[in-house]
Amino acid sequence: MIDLSVYLVLDPDLCGGAQGMIDTTRAAVQSGVRCVQLRAPHWKKRALVECGRALKSVLSGTNAALIINDHADVCLAVNADGLHIGQDDLSPADARAIIGNDRVLGLSVSDEQELAGVDSSLIDHLGVGPIYQTSTKTDAGPELGIEGFARLAARKPCPVVAIGSVKPPIVGELMHAGADGVAVVSAICGQKNPAAAAKALVEEVARARS
């Protein structure tokens, strides 16, 4: 079982390249983050594999999971813990057939229609958003806001993480609205002190659950 409480989605631009993503991951995991996604849409696959293997090494022995965005072949090549797909990527059935049943499969959902189409026998968790508009994913749908997120979370067929300009001040509201965790990019990536930024998010999630 993967701990989705604080789910770090790496951004190579905000982190300053591969080494920056590795350093950010190390800092975040030391602060309690237990799920890290490698997302670099414009990278060649060889670079993704090299970075993925480096991240896998950093995460070894930490109980933190490595998720690969979009690319099932990269997921297998680096022996990642799971794959995350969007609505226009591989179908969940095809993705599951490729990665097998021992890895987790996440899916992005942005509205009620997409939520209604989720097959929870194939999907382990959902990324629901954007909560608010974000510069790190320019093709994201209309913002849900916390109320819109709550409406979707109330019908969740599996665990959900909230994503889209999530910052510490709204973590508690999202958790109380039905989130099983929060996915963040700029709240950790590119911060002057990624370890402190990650710790603040971990503490907000813990506070909301107490």
Go through each PLM region and give its residues:
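Conserved N-terminal beta1-alpha1 strand-loop-helix module at the mouth
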Residues: 1-90, 97-124, 141-147, 151-160, ...
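A short, flexible beta-alpha/helix-coil linker loop
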Residues: 12-13, 132-134
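Short acidic/polar capping segments at secondary-structure boundaries
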Residues: 132-133, 166-168
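Glycine/threonine-rich flexible loop motifs
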Residues: 136-138
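Short helix/strand-capping connector loops at secondary-structure junctions
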Residues: 178-186
